[in-house]
């Protein structure tokens, strides 16, 4: 007989995880496809910062910024369908599913150059041709560099998540002195249009971590540099923030420099020997950093200007655009050419070169075009499906105007005619206006409500989709008309030998 020994641990089975259904289990595809595309989308601005001109503002348009497109699709439940038999409004609701997407970019390729006129680069740490034993009160230098090369394409029906490091609140027992290094924590935020990408200096909140105003290039000086939180979005139970993504990052260290300043965490004497003069402390900081470089820009490694077909998403949402919304997050600094514009200060043509007689301006331009292939789908209104959507995304049921019917009241209620008049009482039970959950966020809004078409063969992406299905552009071939002679040919007579 087996006996339970004293002190032996009892391992219980883990708590079962609440399952999230894949969208394919309750979404029926109708095999009706639409094409949607935008016009040529253009934006122009200053590549480093925002400029105020009179009562107007020149926006900041940098190649190192994210472009986040909020795409509004038409409501398919109010759509004029070619076949009324495909939809039963009393038993199902229609939704859109993304089948294909193409982000086209114009403008020539060019490296993204950034910099700072007073950059904190004390010494060149990779070339040991001279020895500097002390630093002055101001050793900042004019510095320029090409940023880390990045291409990002990310599609979902909710905004993408970004991560960054920032200062954290210290513990009560850890009272920080003035000038001490603050604790750090990793935070998340939605990636908005105009947020800065990580360009080789780390994903961090440089508004709080850059007191010298000289440690970074101008375009990220007072910004939060974000890096897409692929780990968090991949673990999202709903799978709404990232259907799929494509990315390419490229960087190498061009120069190695030393920062200037008072190093409070200098290496101790256990790491080096003192010199003959008895000096035991280092006078040059040991804070080294690398100058990033994106290197060669080529058409061989472009992720744009090509179609992407979504057969199976990485999450549980297989491309369903809930609430008729899509969020397309794009980052691309391979077309980072900035225009240097010189204008005569007095408006007259210059006859000789004089730096005081012309004004300099800086501009960056971007060009986009978006195209989508959408499939019409339906969701059957059942108790299981509604319960699942209520726990997953309640706003879907609110937009479908599906809710619990309250019981009929037996109390006689009052209805005022002029309820907004000062002569009557204040209105009660007023339905609040519908709020946009993304009202406080900044996106490039694109309205495609009137830009859907069933004629796929009339658009480049539509023709590529038809080719994937084995159906190309077919033309009516004219058959050759066979001419017949009314007179029958005479039969040959056989002659016996």
Swiss-Prot record:
Localization per Swiss-Prot or TrEMBL: Virion; Host nucleus
A Pfam family annotated for this UniProt entry: Late_protein_L1
Gene Ontology terms: biological process: endocytosis involved in viral entry into host cell; virion attachment to host cell
Keywords assigned: Capsid protein, Disulfide bond, Host nucleus, Host-virus interaction, Late protein, T=7 icosahedral capsid protein, Viral attachment to host cell, Viral penetration into host cytoplasm, Virion, Virus endocytosis by host, Virus entry into host cell
GO molecular function (one): structural molecule activity
One GO location term (cellular component): host cell nucleus
Primary subcellular site in the record, as a coarse category: virion
Domain of life, source organism: Viruses
Family, as annotated: Belongs to the papillomaviridae L1 protein family.
Oligomeric and partner information: Self-assembles into homopentamers. The capsid has an icosahedral symmetry and consists of 72 capsomers, with each capsomer being a pentamer of L1. Interacts with the minor capsid protein L2; this interaction is necessary for viral genome encapsidation. Interacts with protein E2; this interaction enhances E2-dependent replication and transcription activation.
Function: Forms an icosahedral capsid with a T=7 symmetry and a 50 nm diameter. The capsid is composed of 72 pentamers linked to each other by disulfide bonds and associated with L2 proteins. Binds to heparan sulfate proteoglycans on cell surface of basal layer keratinocytes to provide initial virion attachment. This binding mediates a conformational change in the virus capsid that facilitates efficient infection. The virion enters the host cell via endocytosis. During virus trafficking, L1 protein dissociates from the viral DNA and the genomic DNA is released to the host nucleus.
Protein name: Major capsid protein L1
């Amino acid at each position: 007989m087996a006996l339970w020994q004293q002190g032996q641990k009892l391992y219980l089975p883990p708590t079962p995880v609440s399952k999230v259904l894949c969208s394919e289990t309750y979404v029926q595809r109708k095999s009706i496809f639409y094409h949607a595309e935008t016009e040529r989308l253009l934006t122009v601005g200053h590549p480093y910062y925002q400029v105020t001109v009179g009562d107007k503002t020149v926006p900041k348009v940098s190649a190192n910024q994210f472009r986040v497109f909020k795409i509004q699709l038409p409501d398919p439940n109010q759509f004029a369908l070619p076949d009324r038999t495909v939809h039963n409004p009393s038993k199902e609701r229609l939704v859109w599913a993304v089948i294909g997407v193409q982000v086209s970019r114009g403008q020539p390729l060019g490296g993204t150059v950034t910099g700072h006129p007073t950059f904190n680069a004390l010494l060149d740490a990779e070339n040991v041709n001279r020895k500097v034993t002390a630093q002055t009160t101001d050793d900042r230098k004019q510095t320029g560099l090409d940023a880390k090369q990045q291409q990002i394409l990310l599609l979902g029906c909710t905004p993408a998540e970004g991560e960054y490091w920032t200062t954290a609140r210290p513990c009560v027992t850890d009272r920080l002195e003035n000038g001490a290094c603050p604790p750090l924590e990793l935070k998340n935020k939605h990636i908005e249009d105009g947020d800065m990408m990580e360009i080789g200096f780390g994903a961090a909140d440089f508004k709080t971590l850059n007191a010298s105003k000289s440690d970074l290039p101008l375009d990220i000086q007072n910004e939060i540099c974000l890096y897409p939180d692929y780990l968090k979005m991949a673990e999202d139970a709903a799978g709404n923030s990232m259907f799929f993504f494509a990315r390419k990052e490229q960087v190498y260290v061009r120069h190695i420099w030393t920062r200037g300043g008072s190093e409070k965490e200098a290496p101790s004497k256990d790491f080096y020997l003192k010199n003959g003069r008895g000096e035991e402390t280092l006078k040059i900081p040991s804070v080294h950093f690398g100058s990033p470089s994106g290197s060669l820009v080529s058409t061989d490694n472009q992720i744009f200007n090509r179609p992407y077909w979504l057969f199976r998403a990485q999450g549980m949402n297989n491309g369903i655009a809930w609430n008729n919304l899509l969020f397309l997050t794009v980052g691309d600094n391979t077309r980072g050419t900035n225009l240097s514009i010189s204008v005569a200060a007095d408006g007259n043509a210059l006859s000789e070169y004089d730096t005081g007689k012309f004004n300099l301006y800086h501009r960056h331009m971007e060009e986009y075009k978006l195209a989508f292939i959408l499939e019409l789908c339906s969701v059957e209104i059942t108790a299981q499906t509604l319960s699942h959507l209520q726990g997953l995304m309640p706003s879907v049921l609110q937009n479908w105007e599906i809710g619990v019917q309250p019981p009929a009241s037996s109390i006689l209620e009052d209805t005022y005619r002029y309820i907004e008049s000062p002569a009557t009482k204040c209105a009660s039970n007023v339905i609040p206006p519908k709020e946009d959950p993304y009202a406080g966020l900044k996106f490039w809004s694109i309205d495609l409500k009137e830009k859907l078409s069933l004629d796929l063969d009339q658009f480049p992406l539509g023709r590529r989709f038809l080719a994937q299905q084995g159906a190309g552009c077919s033309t009516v071939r004219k058959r050759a008309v066979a001419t017949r002679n009314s007179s029958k040919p005479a039969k040959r007579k056989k002659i016996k030998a």
